[in-house]
From Swiss-Prot:
This is 23S rRNA (uracil(747)-C(5))-methyltransferase RlmC. It is an enzyme of class 2 (transferase). Catalyzes the formation of 5-methyl-uridine at position 747 (m5U747) in 23S rRNA. [4Fe-4S] cluster binds at residues 3, 11, 14, 87.
C-alpha cells in the first residue's frame, strides 16, 4: 500500500507499512504462537487475511484549522493539523463526503476546537458506513451545546447534499483531554441506528456502540465462531462482553439457550433487536457487568464465550471459570498477550484450536479466536 502521508512522516498510524503484507502476517502469527503454551499440541489454523486498502467502515477525524478552512484528519504533537481525507484505508464512498462536511462546518459556524487556546467547539467528526446498504452515520463531537441550534438550522442543507446520512448525532465532550467522546449523545435524525448484516445475521450500529472497523474480516471471525460452536452440539451458552451480540447470534441455533451480557445498555438494545428479527425465542440479553453476572451464578452452561476488552477477562473471572468448569470456553481477543495470561490461569483447560484474524493490517495488532476444552481429570 502506498500512502503519501506516511511517506512524508505526517501519519504514523500504519507502523508496519514498510513490511510486505505476507511478512506482516508471518510476524503476527509468530507473535501469537510465541505467547501460547508449548507443552502440548493444538490445531493452528491458517490466518484470515484482510484487504490491504479500503477495508475500514469508519473514519475518526480530528477537526483543526479554521471554521472557513477546516482540516479533517489528525493533529501532530506540535499542534499542526494533517488532512487525512485521502487515507487509503477508507472506502471510496467516503471521498466525496469529506468536502461537503468541510463546507457544512463553515455554513453551521462550527469553530474547530483549538487545544492550545482551549477555544472552539468542534473536536471530532466520526463517519461510519453500513456495507449492507451503504447508508452512513455521522457524529459531531462538540465541546458544549453552544452551537447546537446553529447545527440544527443548517442540517437540512447537509441532508440534501448527502441523503445517505441515515443517522446524524451530536456528542458532547466538555473535557480538555484526548477523549474521543462524552456521555451525552443527542440524535438529530428519526433513525437512531445503522442496519448491518454479517452472514445473514442482522446487526445494528448505534452512535455510542462498539462495532468492528474491518467488516469483511469481522464477518469471517463471527462465521468461524459459529461454525466451531455448531460442531460442539451444545444447548446452552453465555456470551460475556457480548457487545451488540455478533458472536452469540452467530452461535445460537433455534433452540439454543443464549444469555448475552454487556455493560452498555445501547449495545444490549441492539442485540435484543437482532434476536427479535431472527425469531430466536430462547435468547436473553442483559446490560450488566460480565464478571459480576457470572460470579452470581451457581452453575454454568456447556460453553462460555468471552470477547473482553484489551485487558482480558481478568483473574477473578478466570478463577471462577476454572472452578465451575464449563466444558468449553471460546475466547475472542484483540490482545493476545492478555489472552495468553488468562489461558495460563485457566489451568483446567487446554487449547483445542486457534486462528488469527488480521483485523488491523499494517499494524502489529490482530484478533485471535481460541477454543479451550476442559481437560478430563
Amino acid at each position: 500500500m502506498q500512502c503519501a502521508r506516511s511517506s512524508a512522516g505526517d501519519c504514523h498510524s500504519c507502523g508496519w507499512l514498510s513490511l510486505a503484507y505476507s511478512e506482516q502476517i508471518n510476524q503476527k502469527q509468530h507473535n501469537l504462537l510465541d505467547l501460547l503454551p508449548k507443552n502440548y499440541a493444538f490445531t493452528q489454523l491458517a490466518p484470515v487475511e484482510s484487504q490491504q486498502v479500503k477495508f475500514r467502515n469508519k473514519a475518526k477525524m480530528v477537526v483543526s484549522g479554521s471554521v472557513e478552512k477546516p482540516i479533517l484528519g489528525l493533529r501532530k504533537p506540535e499542534g499542526e493539523g494533517v488532512d487525512l481525507c485521502q487515507c487509503p484505508l477508507y472506502p471510496a464512498s467516503f471521498e466525496p463526503v469529506f468536502p461537503i462536511l468541510k463546507t457544512f462546518i463553515a455554513k453551521a459556524g462550527l469553530v474547530p476546537y483549538n487545544v492550545e487556546r482551549r477555544r472552539g467547539e468542534l473536536k471530532f467528526i466520526l463517519l461510519t458506513e453500513s456495507r449492507h446498504n451503504h447508508s452512513m452515520m455521522l457524529r459531531f463531537v462538540l465541546r458544549s451545546e453552544k452551537k447546537l441550534a446553529q447545527l440544527r438550522q443548517a442540517l437540512p442543507w447537509l441532508q440534501a447534499q448527502l441523503p445517505q446520512l441515515a443517522v446524524i448525532s451530536v456528542n458532547i465532550q466538555p473535557v480538555h483531554m484526548a477523549i474521543l467522546e462524552g456521555e451525552q449523545e443527542i440524535v438529530l435524525t428519526e433513525k437512531t441506528f445503522l442496519d448491518e448484516y454479517f452472514n445473514e445475521i442482522p446487526l445494528h450500529i448505534r452512535p455510542k456502540g462498539f462495532f468492528q472497523t474491518n467488516p469483511d474480516v469481522a464477518a469471517s471471525l463471527y462465521a468461524t465462531a459459529g461454525h466451531w460452536v455448531k460442531e460442539l452440539q451444545i444447548n446452552r451458552l453465555w456470551d460475556l462482553f457480548c457487545g451488540s451480540g455478533g458472536f452469540g447470534l452467530h452461535c445460537a441455533q433455534k433452540n439454543t439457550e443464549l444469555t448475552g451480557i454487556e455493560i452498555s445498555p445501547e449495545a444490549i438494545e441492539c442485540a435484543r433487536l437482532s434476536a427479535n428479527e431472527l425469531g430466536l425465542e430462547h435468547v436473553e440479553f442483559q446490560a450488566l457487568d460480565s464478571t459480576g453476572f457470572a460470579l452470581a451464578k451457581e452453575s454454568v452452561p456447556e460453553l462460555v464465550l468471552v470477547n473482553p476488552p484489551r485487558r482480558g477477562i481478568g483473574e477473578t473471572l478466570c478463577d471462577y471459570l476454572n472452578s465451575m468448569k464449563p466444558r468449553f470456553i471460546l475466547y475472542s481477543s484483540c490482545n493476545a498477550q492478555t489472552m495468553a495470561k488468562d489461558i495460563q490461569q485457566l489451568s483446567h483447560y487446554r487449547i483445542d484450536r486457534v486462528q488469527l484474524f488480521d483485523m488491523f493490517p499494517h499494524t502489529a495488532h490482530y484478533e485471535v479466536l481460541t477454543l479451550l476444552v476442559l481437560q478430563q481429570s
